[in-house]
Amino acid sequence: MNVTTTRKDLMIVNMGPHHPSMHGVLRLILTLDGEDVIDCEPILGYLHRGMEKIAENRTVIQYLPYVTRWDYLATMFTEAITVNGPEQLGNIQVPKRASYIRVIMLELSRIASHLLWLGPFMADIGAQTPFFYIFRERELVYDLFEAATGMRMMHNYFRIGGVAADLPYGWIDKCLDFCDYFLTAVSEYQKLITRNPIFLERVEGVGIIGPEEAINWGLSGPMLRASGIQWDLRKVDHYECYDELDWEIFWQKEGDSLARYLVRIGEMRESIKIIQQALEGIPGGPYENLETRCFARERDPEWNDFEYRFISKKPSPTFELPKQELYVRVEAPKGELGIFLIGDQSGFPWRWKIRPPGFINLQILPQLVKRMKLADIMTILGSIDIIMGEVDR
């Protein structure tokens, strides 16, 4: 009797672009030997919309609604970076009250982003309950956004020299109530998840990144801090009014998926601490710098020149970006979000290069999943936290 010989061929499998664990339209071409991953090739570009080229054909004010579509789960950060660049180029001072309002909005946005990372990450691993819990808290954050900005997601709230509107009456008390409630919710998550043996089995020691490796790959945000490096642009660059508030950089040294989970949970607690201090210490005064109106140009464009074709006969109020180049960055929930901006003495930027954290953090994925099991891909990709809107731009 002949024993049937088993085939030893490698198998090539497509994951995505329509896969629930891909967090958007990411496609992975996997080479498998049974359950073991031999190779992984990410295919990007399914959500490419030419955001950098669009920026060159818009004034900064016209471009503001577009930027909320990069990372559509943390839109305040994309708005912050879009107004910070022209503010630095034009030496525009932001009033203290506006700076405090910005910090409150940024940290609320960070919490909303981390919540919508936690739910799907747990669902990928096989825990369904936290997925429903996080929407309960995220809804409260969006209620606060809606009361202050009028929009739940694409806020369009930041303006050059300040913010679009002051905080409405009663909003500060409502936000303080949310902060008190949310700390108990985070404790509930930790009770539910952190010591769960099945969860620990799936994440402990999976996707380990050492500190030197993290720096060499250019990682940032929770990916970097989970590898033992205390680097946070809020402390390093001293932007807005973070220096006036008392908070700590949360970090872990293990570098695995569990460490990345713990860093994000810790960051949510620190964000609440920052928001509470900012709400209690928020000064009075204007919420925007009215001097920015002086930058409004009313000169008539020449017939058929570049600006004439885009802004039409009546120029919209904007200001010239001086002939300089500038790199601005903020600490977004996913890492360092930056733009490289070149002005050309016109209303349009000559070059607008986006440095998305998700795109750079994703580069290490093939190295992390090699020699791992197929099921670990969901864990590792989930712990990186990517949004394809900013990866593909």
UniProtKB/Swiss-Prot annotation:
The gene is ndhH. It comes from the Eukaryota. It comes from Eucalyptus globulus subsp. globulus. InterPro entries: NADH_Q_OxRdtase_suD (IPR001135), NADH_UbQ_OxRdtase_49kDa_CS (IPR014029), NDH1_su_D/H (IPR022885), NiFe-Hase_large (IPR029014). PROSITE patterns: COMPLEX1_49K. This is NAD(P)H-quinone oxidoreductase subunit H, chloroplastic. The lineage of its organism: Eukaryota, Viridiplantae, Streptophyta, Embryophyta, Tracheophyta. The keyword Chloroplast applies. One of its GO terms (molecular function) is quinone binding. It is a peripheral membrane protein. Its EC number is 7.1.1.-. NDH shuttles electrons from NAD(P)H:plastoquinone, via FMN and iron-sulfur (Fe-S) centers, to quinones in the photosynthetic chain and possibly in a chloroplast respiratory chain. The immediate electron acceptor for the enzyme in this species is believed to be plastoquinone. Couples the redox reaction to proton translocation, and thus conserves the redox energy in a proton gradient. Keywords: Chloroplast, Membrane, NAD, NADP, Plastid, Plastoquinone, Quinone, Thylakoid, Translocase, Transport. It catalyses: a plastoquinone + NADH + (n+1) H(+)(in) = a plastoquinol + NAD(+) + n H(+)(out); a plastoquinone + NADPH + (n+1) H(+)(in) = a plastoquinol + NADP(+) + n H(+)(out). Belongs to the complex I 49 kDa subunit family. Pfam families: Complex1_49kDa (PF00346). It is found in: Plastid, Chloroplast thylakoid membrane. NDH is composed of at least 16 different subunits, 5 of which are encoded in the nucleus. GO terms for cellular component: chloroplast thylakoid membrane. The keyword Plastid applies.
